[in-house]
């Protein structure tokens, strides 16, 4: 996923049948996907390696009883796959990653390694076969990873609290992974695997030094026995805050080094006529409103000594904005919150100039193109849209979408951000 903002997508049947250009390469849907949700090949002649990405179309948002169970399941599936094919687990699950909406397993090699890569990929869908002691010991590894992240970013806890207040929940779009660490069990992970790690909830992206014919042959060889079933539905897409919510919670804690507020706001972009265009417009719009608030509260103002922002979008037009603010000495958290709310309210789209839009557009086009220089970024972009079933896209292709994003849609998103909508703050 792109680190600047995270973009969340689900299926749209129209574009699953369309070929997408990737520089000189083509994103080709494989004709026979067998039981898989979808499969693509991306021939890249300039590369000597082959990358196979298995995208499980479920992640932490799909947890409904135990936060962190998707992460623990990822560990077991990755290590079991390694043990089955390589006869021993690799040192860690370095080839796997759990996000909010998906779990991605990546295996890389050259053409001589293709059968081994396919076996590793196929084995992820098999129920993890590891000793009971090994499976239980991996819970301690997950705990250490979570605690390490918490120590390095104490504000993660505050950000989780504000999302729990916004959605009135501890699961789905909100989570509580630290509190639930002692709830992790082998049985819960196997249950999660049995429900979500099915072919029809999985997508494969094969890229690099390979052609369509060979990719189809290998897909049939290793997944030809799979049967199509229903995909696991994303129930979190229906999880929204209460209309008119303005939750204000004051706490006292010694877990943070400085006084800090965490703010979350939920709003919507209702025009879903162009799903791909919506993401590009959002990329620019969020850059503009982030810049305005950063100028008012941090660069030009006397409110924040530290200010960070993030925005997320879902395919149904739901948008989530979060901000963390550490005020200057002498500025109370209550005053900082008032300044933040007033800065959002006063962001008038009539004052946003064509030049400002084009600067934001050019900046994001350049940023996205720069990611094309990194092989890792290419893989991230391939899986980005694929995280919920859409065809892969490259950094350069996404930069074209940004360049063509309509000004009208950009301003509509900013207007929706400014308008009154459900929010929560922790002071």
Where are these regions (language model features)?
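An aromatic/glycine/proline-enriched structural segment found at the starts
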Residues: 168, 199, 203-271
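M16/MPP (pitrilysin/insulinase) zinc-metallopeptidase core fold and M16-derived inactive scaffolds
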Residues: 53-111, 171-175, 290-305, 315
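Histidine-acidic residue clusters that define the catalytic metal-binding segment
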Residues: 25-31, 163-202, 236-239, 269-273, ...
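C-terminal regions of mature proteins
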Residues: 203-209, 347, 351, 355-427
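Bacterial N-terminal signal peptides that target proteins for export
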Residues: 1-9
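Bacterial N-terminal signal peptides
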Residues: 8-19
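Acidic/histidine-enriched segments that form metal/cofactor-coordinating
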Residues: 90-192, 342, 354-376
